[in-house]
């Protein structure tokens, strides 16, 4: 009877250790993409030179951002010289086509907008005022 009790206690201990190990790993696995901040490049409204299509690094930083479903995307206008938007959709040439998934409206320098995606996928976005400013949010 003592041997069975010892095995039962050992089994419970092993299960507890496995559960504790899994729980401690879960936050680290999701923390990488729980939130992301996207900012505008300074003076990106004055010139298209920041645009990737013009050989620049992109007018938003990062140009491609990744976040988990339920994570928080913070979009901030850090450009002290201009008003910008972060509007979901695409641009064909200079013809914007919003898709209604998110739209910050006009953000003055220092203003921010938060969006919490609920569906995975690729979300292209652009600035309604400066159509060369484009980026993509990948939601996993």
Residue positions per predicted region:
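Bacterial N-terminal signal peptides
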Residues: 13-24
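Extracytoplasmic copper-binding redox domains, predominantly the cupredoxin/blue-copper superfamily
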Residues: 5, 10, 26-140
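N-terminal amphipathic/basic-hydrophobic helices that include classical n-h-c signal peptides
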Residues: 1-3
């Amino acid at each position: 009877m003592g041997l069975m009790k010892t095995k039962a206690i050992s089994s419970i201990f092993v299960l507890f250790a496995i559960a504790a190990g899994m729980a401690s790993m879960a936050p680290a696995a999701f923390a990488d993409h729980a939130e992301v901040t996207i900012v505008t490049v300074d003076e990106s409204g004055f010139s298209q030179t920041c645009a990737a299509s013009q050989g620049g690094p992109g007018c938003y930083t990062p140009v491609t951002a990744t976040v988990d479903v339920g994570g928080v995307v913070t979009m901030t206008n850090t450009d002290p010289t201009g008003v910008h938007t972060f509007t979901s959709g695409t641009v064909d040439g200079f013809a914007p086509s919003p898709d209604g998934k998110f739209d910050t409206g006009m953000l003055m320098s220092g203003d921010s907008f938060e969006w919490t995606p609920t569906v995975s996928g690729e979300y292209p976005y652009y600035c309604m005022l400066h159509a060369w400013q484009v980026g993509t949010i990948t939601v996993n």
